[in-house]
C-alpha cells in the first residue's frame, strides 16, 4: 500500500496489541513496544547449518510485542492466533519434558542464555502479534526468539548487542526447542 495506508495499518496493529495486552494483563501498566523482523534467505538455503555460507536479509514483516516487567519471577506470553497463554517459572532453568517444540521452551532457553551471560533478569508479561506467519519460510521462530530477547534486554537493561542476543536465541532453539540450526535466522532478525 501507500505510505499513509501502511502507517494507518501499523498504527491500528500497535493499538490493537496494546488493547490485547491490557485485556490479558490489566490496564495502567508501564509498557514498552518491541519489534523483531522476519527474514528472507537470499542464498545458501540450508547451507548455514551444514557449515556453509548463507545470505539473509530482514523483511518488513515483523513480530510486535507489548511488554511490561513484573516482580513475581514468571514470564507470561500471549500470542495472537494461539489459544494458549505461556507461563514460565524462571526458577526452573533446565528444559522441561514435553516442552520442546513449544514457545515455552524458547522462552525458558532464552532466559537461561541471559543468565549464562551473567545478566540479571526477571519476569515480564507480554502480548505478541506477528505478521511473520508460521510456515511462510520467513522464520517466525527467529522473530519470536529475538522479540523475547529484546524484551529482556530492554526491560532489564542487559546491554547486549544484537549479535549476542542472536547467539542466546540460537542456543534456546538448538538446546531447548531441540531444532538443529545455525544462527543465520536470528542474526537476520
Q: In which residue ranges do the predicted regions lie?
A:
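ATP-binding N-lobe of GHMP and related small-molecule kinases
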Residues: 1-142, 146-162, 168, 172-177, ...
Amino acid at each position: 500500500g501507500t505510505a499513509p495506508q501502511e502507517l494507518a495499518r501499523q498504527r491500528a496493529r500497535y493499538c490493537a496489541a496494546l488493547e490485547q495486552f491490557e485485556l490479558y494483563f490489566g490496564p495502567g501498566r508501564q509498557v514498552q513496544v518491541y519489534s523483531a523482523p522476519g527474514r528472507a534467505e537470499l542464498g545458501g538455503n540450508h547451507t548455514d547449518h551444514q557449515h556453509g555460507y548463507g545470505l539473509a536479509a530482514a523483511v518488513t514483516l515483523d513480530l510486535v510485542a507489548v511488554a511490561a516487567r513484573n516482580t513475581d519471577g514468571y514470564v507470561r506470553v500471549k500470542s495472537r492466533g494461539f489459544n494458549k497463554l505461556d507461563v514460565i517459572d524462571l526458577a526452573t532453568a533446565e528444559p522441561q519434558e514435553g516442552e520442546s517444540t513449544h514457545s515455552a521452551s524458547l522462552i525458558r532457553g532464552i532466559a537461561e542464555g541471559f543468565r549464562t551471560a551473567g545478566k540479571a533478569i526477571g519476569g515480564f508479561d507480554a502480548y505478541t502479534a506477528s505478521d511473520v506467519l508460521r510456515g511462510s519460510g520467513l522464520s517466525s521462530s527467529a522473530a519470536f526468539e529475538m522479540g523475547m530477547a529484546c524484551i529482556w534486554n530492554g526491560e532489564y537493561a542487559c546491554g547486549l548487542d544484537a549479535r549476542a542476543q542472536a547467539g542466546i536465541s540460537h542456543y534456546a532453539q538448538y538446546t531447548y526447542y531441540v531444532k538443529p540450526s545455525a544462527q543465520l535466522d536470528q542474526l537476520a532478525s
